[in-house]
Amino acid sequence: MALTLIKEDGTGKVDANAYANAADGAAYHDGHLFASAWTAATLANKETALAMATRLIDAEYQFDGVKANEAQALQWPRAGCHDPDADGWNGGTVADNTVPKAVMEATCEMARELLIVDRTAAPVGEGLKYYNDGSVQTGYDKGDRRPVISHVAQALLMKFGSLVKSKSGAVRLTRT
């Protein structure tokens, strides 16, 4: 069955599966120096990458505020999400009927990354610190892990929430 890409438009769709569509991706990658993976992909692969990027962003990030509509499929739109760029020193919130441009751009960036490599799979040698062949000695580094969400996408998303760290022992608190 072919994927039908349904972009979240800020209304809290119950069937949305992406924060961006292929036209958004084309506009984002128009000024991107390393856009070849995106431009070479078929429309079907672009849409699949956008849907997967959206799923990964929703799974890996805990955004501030709450879903604007309890029945909506995705994390955005949100109510009460702080926007540090909104009202200068006073702060402000993202409108609860919109998906921020940075979230759309992070989705496009992640889609391009996914067209290059499956970021959910461990790369060859991940975690290997050293390996000696003579009398076989191997050492591992638990910190040597490629993040699922690229550093560029993380930078775009971080002002709206935080990356969920597994087994971190910390709880995110929000004042109301």
Language model features with spans:
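Divalent metal-cofactor coordination and adjacent catalytic microenvironments
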Residues: M1-T176
